[in-house]
Regions:
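Membrane-cytosol interface segments
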Residues: 1-126, 380-405
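Histidine- and acidic-residue-rich, metal-dependent catalytic cores
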Residues: 99-405
Length: 405
C-alpha cells in the first residue's frame, strides 16, 4: 500500500501565520502542545514552537499561508533531537545492594513473557496486567541502579531467543528512557512496548522462527507479517497505550525510509519506535543465533553508530551510546595490563575506568576466583584501564562459570 502524504517539512524559522502543524520533529508528549495538531495564529505561536523544535510538518490541505519554502532533508543529513530532560535521575541503590532485587526482577520478567506468549498461542487475549507485572519491577530496578540489572542480564542469557530478547530490550528501553529524563510512566510504557514488540511472532510458524539460515524472499515477507499480527493482538486485547502501539507497529521502520511496513522516514516515525529500532538491533547483535555468533557489546554499539543518520536518528544513537557507555556493563574486555575482565559498574565521568571483575592473570590464565577492581581507585605506579573489547567467549572464558556457581 502506498500512502500519499499531504505534509511538508518546514523549518521553524520559515513558519508563517496561517499554517497548520500536524507533526513535530519529536513526540508531542515532549511539548506542551495539543496532541491533535497546532494552528499558527501569531508570531508568538512560532516563537513557542521554536523553543522545542528545529522543524515541523505542516498539513498542506489545512494550510492557508502562501509561499511555503519546503526544505529537503537529505538521507545523510542529521535531524536534530533537542530533547529537554524533565528529570535527571541519580542511582538510589548501591550496585551490591541491588543485585538480589535485579535478579528477582529479571526472573519475574522472563517468566511473565513466557506466560504472555503461551496465552496468545492458546488464543487468549493479551492481559495487560501480566505485562505490568513483568515490567514494573524491572523498571524500578533499572531506576535504582541500571548497572546491577544489566550485570544480571549479561549472566542469564538463555537459548530461548524470543523471551530473552524481549526482556533485554524492555530493560534497555527503561535505561534509555531514564537517560533521556522521561517521567516514570512514560518509561513504563517504553518498557512494555519493547517487551511486546515481537509478540506477533507468536502467530508465525515455528519452522520459520527456528530457521538456522537466511530467509528467502517469500519467507522474509512472511516473517515481516509479525508487525501486522502484533498490532492485531493489541487491538483484540484492547491495548490503547500509544507508545506500545507505536513500538509494535513501527520498530522496523528506518530513519532513511528503508524500513517496513510503511517505509516511514524521519520524524514520521514516532519517537518511541525510533528508540526501539536502535534497542532491537543492538540486542539482536549481542545475542547468538543459530546462523551467526554474537558480537561484543562494544562492537554492537559501533555497528549502531555506523548506521547513524541513515538507519537510525543520529542524535538518538549518540544518546544511546552515552546511556550505555563505551564498554557497556557485561562487556568482556582486555585491560592494558593484559588481564581479562568483565565490566560491572560504569564510571560515567571516566568511561575507560569502570569497576571490573578481573578473571585472568596477565598471561590469560584463569584465576581460581575473580577479583573486583575499581579502576578509578588504583594505587601504585601502574595505571590500568580498559584497553579493548573482546568478543564473547574469547580465550575460552565464560563469565557464568565465575559468577553463577
Amino acid at each position: 500500500v502506498v500512502y500519499e502524504l499531504v505534509e511538508r517539512r518546514v523549518l521553524v524559522r520559515d513558519l508563517e501565520v496561517g499554517m497548520y502543524i500536524c507533526r513535530l520533529d519529536r513526540s508531542w508528549h515532549e511539548t506542551p502542545f495539543p496532541l491533535q495538531g497546532l494552528a499558527v495564529h501569531s508570531d508568538a505561536d512560532i516563537e513557542a514552537v521554536g523553543r522545542y523544535c528545529e522543524y515541523v510538518f505542516v498539513d498542506t490541505q489545512r494550510d492557508v499561508a502562501a509561499d511555503i519554502r519546503p526544505q529537503v532533508l537529505r538521507r545523510t543529513e542529521p535531524s536534530p533531537v533537542r530533547f529537554r530532560r524533565s528529570q535527571v535521575y541519580q542511582d538510589t541503590a548501591r550496585f551490591d545492594d541491588e543485585l538480589a532485587r535485579a535478579g528477582e526482577a529479571f526472573d519475574n520478567a522472563s517468566a511473565c513473557m513466557e506466560e504472555i506468549v503461551d496465552a496468545i498461542v492458546q488464543g487468549q487475549v493479551l492481559d495487560i496486567e501480566v505485562v505490568a507485572r513483568a515490567v514494573r519491577p524491572m523498571v524500578d530496578s533499572v531506576m535504582r541502579s541500571g548497572d546491577a540489572f544489566f550485570w544480571i542480564e549479561s549472566l542469564r542469557r538463555r537459548d530461548i531467543y524470543t523471551y530473552q530478547h524481549a526482556v533485554s530490550c524492555s530493560a534497555l528501553a527503561a535505561a534509555f528512557g531514564r537517560h533521556m529524563g522521561f517521567d516514570q510512566e512514560t518509561i513504563v510504557s517504553l518498557a512494555a512496548g519493547n517487551l511486546l514488540m515481537d509478540v506477533g511472532k507468536s502467530q508465525l510458524p515455528d519452522e520459520l522462527l527456528l530457521r538456522a539460515g537466511p530467509l528467502d524472499a517469500q519467507e522474509m515477507a512472511l516473517a515481516r507479517l509479525h508487525v501486522e499480527e502484533g498490532l492485531g493482538i493489541l487491538a483484540h486485547s484492547g491495548v490503547m497505550d500509544v507508545d506500545v502501539r507505536d513500538i509494535v507497529g513501527s520498530h522496523h521502520e528506518r530513519f532513511d525510509g528503508g524500513g517496513y511496513p510503511q517505509g516511514l522516514a524521519g520524524a514520521a516515525i514516532p519517537l518511541a519506535a525510533r528508540m526501539a529500532a536502535i534497542i532491537d538491533t543492538y540486542d539482536a547483535l549481542c545475542t547468538p543465533r543459530p546462523y551467526r555468533e554474537a558480537v561484543s557489546r562494544h562492537h554492537a554499539l559501533r555497528e549502531i553508530y555506523a548506521g547513524r543518520d541513515s538507519a537510525f536518528q543520529g542524535e538518538l544513537v549518540e544518546q544511546f551510546q552515552s546511556c550505555l557507555g563505551v564498554y557497556p556493563t557485561g562487556s568482556l574486555v582486555e585491560l592494558t595490563s593484559g588481564e581479562i575482565a568483565i565490566v560491572m559498574v560504569q564510571n560515567h565521568a571516566r568511561r575507560l575506568l569502570p569497576r571490573v571483575a578481573v578473571l585472568t592473570t596477565r598471561e590469560k590464565a584463569p584465576l581460581d576466583d575473580f577479583r573486583i577492581v575499581d579502576l578509578m581507585r588504583q594505587v601504585g605506579h601502574e595505571h590500568v584501564e580498559v584497553g579493548r573489547s573482546l568478543p564473547p567467549g574469547s580465550h575460552g572464558i565464560d563469565p557464568k562459570e565465575f559468577f553463577l556457581q
